[in-house]
Regions:
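C-terminal regulatory/interaction module of P-loop NTP-utilizing enzymes
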Residues: 1-367
Length: 367
């Protein structure tokens, strides 16, 4: 357990995670109050990484539940090992036959077999999934419930007992209560609103893209091999790309990847040509690439003209109405694109909120 907020910052920094005062305070309170932590924000700002680093910093085992649409409780809580149950019935056929051998009628035989039902629906045949495993674990764990907003609302209801009391009820067996409360971290990309009942049970943290100074500090801490001067320029370029109307804004991890890419190529000067040749490291959709190519010259030099060569070498030309963006249908939107569309966040473009004073309580910047 951490002794202070500063202790949290130092422990996370020791694992390569740069945390500001607000983030460190929230994590400190989570560990002291034994409350789940819900982290919301755009993709790629370090929500999942925080859970991993917390596990490493506290020397706890990490259990992860990756949420997805259509997920049911058998994949999250527990399920019965039917194969094992069937195997036992085959092995115990003779014993079962003895139990019903002197039964005078079918009803009596069924009653006798039913009396043994608890044997087959016992802890012996219970297959734990991440949520139940976190409760039953004898060692301290960090439970990461990743992208809870991707799951159906029914799964949220299943989580309430765990989040509120650190226990899981199995009707056939009973209630399992954690002997050592897990550190529970839930993440959400805000593709939908979460239930108020779930939020009430959690501490809340909003993670946004960090300020330029902090993002530069993060890039430096990763030993990318890029000089400070080039790293500073690169961070400014990435922040400029995030201001564009892109389907997916560049994440912090992609900024780091871009820095490493430029270092591997031995780049000693940033220019629009170099950046355009490597922009696919941070821009992953064809239409976004074209927008980025148009913007890169002015992001490097506001007075620069756009060289025609920047538009060449990024795939063959398309006829009218044709695009590499196969995820889009005739209406120009796919299910995933709809979930990640610009404007999902109340303050503006997805991952690029309106500029507000740093003291605003609703938009703390941290990584």
């Amino acid at each position: 357990m951490f002794d202070s907020v500063q202790d949290v910052r130092e422990a996370l920094a020791g694992e390569g995670y740069i945390a500001d005062e607000h983030l460190a305070t929230t994590v400190f309170l989570q560990t002291r109050l034994d409350k789940p932590l819900l982290i919301e924000g755009p993709a790629g700002v370090g929500k999942t990484e925080l859970a991993k680093v917390l596990a490493a910093a506290t020397d706890r085992r990490l259990l992860r539940l990756q949420c997805y649409e259509g997920q049911d409780e058998t994949k999250a809580l527990y399920e019965w090992d039917y194969g094992k149950q069937l195997l036992y019935t085959q092995i115990l056929r003779e014993k079962i036959a003895q139990i019903v051998s002197d039964a005078t009628d079918l009803e009596t035989a069924v009653e006798r077999i039913g009396a043994q039902e608890s044997v087959f629906f016992s802890d012996r045949f219970l297959a734990s999934r991440p949520l139940l495993e976190a409760v039953r674990s004898e060692e301290p764990v960090v439970l990461l419930i990743d992208e809870i907003d991707r799951a159906d609302e029914a799964l949220e209801a299943v989580l309430l007992e765990l989040l509120g009391e650190y226990q899981v009820s199995v009707p056939e067996v009973g209630t399992f209560t954690a002997t050592c409360a897990p550190y529970v971290v839930l993440t959400s990309n805000n593709t939908r609103d979460l239930a108020a009942a779930l939020k009430r049970r959690c501490l809340h943290l909003f993670l946004d893209y960090p300020a330029a100074e902090r993002e530069l500090e993060i890039v430096r801490s990763k030993d990318t091999g890029l000089t400070d001067a080039l790293a500073t320029q690169l961070v400014d370029v990435v922040r400029g790309l995030r201001e564009l109307d892109l389907r997916k804004a560049p994440s912090i991890s992609e900024t780091i990847d871009w820095a490493r890419t430029l270092a591997v190529l031995g780049v000693d000067e940033l220019n629009a040509k170099v950046l355009s040749d490597t922009v696919s490291v941070v821009v992953k959709y064809d239409k976004d690439v074209h927008k980025a190519l148009d913007a890169l010259p002015r992001l490097v030099d506001p007075n620069a003209a756009v060289p025609e060569s920047l538009h060449n070498g990024h795939g063959h030309s398309h006829g009218p109405g044709h695009s590499h963006d196969h995820d889009h249908g005739p209406d120009g939107k796919a299910v995933r694109a709809e979930k990640d569309r610009p404007g999902r966040f109340a303050d503006g473009y997805y991952g690029t909120p309106k500029k507000t004073p740093s003291s605003s309580p609703g938009r703390r910047r941290a990584f």
